[in-house]
């Protein structure tokens, strides 16, 4: 499928589609969140998506198929973001990787991961809710392994995964 995919930076007009895709992707997990733990907050906020698109601190990429966004990724290797997530310098932290349900298991997520510039990186890091088994399986198949080192409270609801570059 790679030959028909277009990887590009998003524009302001993409924010609405990206937001809806994020909302659709996370909505199944919001209904099972009965925990009051602040460590299990899934944020669905259009302003956050706008930040990913507009702020230079983030790398944001979209994948298009036939002029339609099939998936997108946002992350950063900037100190400001890495320190906020407890990551070491030299990492790239994935804030979001979202694939439209119609395009899952078709290589879109892997295509997005390959779009991350690897220069001077030591690892790619992502946090995902334990209940999102589909995401965990995707990351494991992509070479990510579960890592420890954060608070015990974090690991009650989330898992951190890392892949050496």
Report each predicted region and the residues it spans.
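Conserved beta-strand in the GNAT
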Residues: 62, 68-77, 93, 98
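Conserved acetyl-CoA-binding loop-helix of GNAT-fold acetyltransferases
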Residues: 99, 105-118, 137-141
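Conserved acetyl-CoA binding element of GNAT-fold acetyltransferases
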Residues: 84-101, 127
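Conserved GNAT-fold acetyl-CoA-binding loop/helix
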Residues: 23-49
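A short beta-loop-alpha structural element at the N-terminal edge
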Residues: 5-20
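A short helix-loop-beta-strand connector motif used in the catalytic cores of GNAT acetyltransferases and
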Residues: 47-62
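Conserved beta-strand-loop-alpha-helix junction that forms the acyl-donor binding cleft
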Residues: 104, 125-137, 152-157
């Amino acid at each position: 499928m790679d030959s028909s995919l277009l990887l590009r930076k998003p524009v302001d007009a993409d924010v609405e589609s990206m937001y809806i895709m994020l909302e659709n992707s996370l909505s199944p997990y919001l209904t099972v969140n009965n925990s009051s733990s602040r460590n299990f907050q899934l944020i669905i906020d259009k302003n956050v998506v706008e930040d990913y698109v507009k702020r230079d601190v983030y790398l944001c990429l979209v994948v298009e198929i036939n002029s339609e966004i099939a998936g997108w990724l946002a992350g950063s290797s900037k100190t400001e973001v890495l320190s906020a997530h407890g990551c070491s310098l030299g990492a790239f932290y994935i804030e979001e990787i979202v694939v439209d349900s119609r395009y899952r298991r078709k290589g879109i997520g892997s295509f997005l991961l390959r779009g991350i510039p690897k220069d001077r990186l030591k690892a790619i890091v992502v946090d995902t809710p334990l209940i999102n088994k589909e995401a965990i399986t995707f990351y494991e198949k992509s070479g990510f392994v579960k890592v420890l080192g954060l608070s015990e409270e974090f690991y009650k609801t989330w898992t951190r995964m890392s892949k050496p570059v």
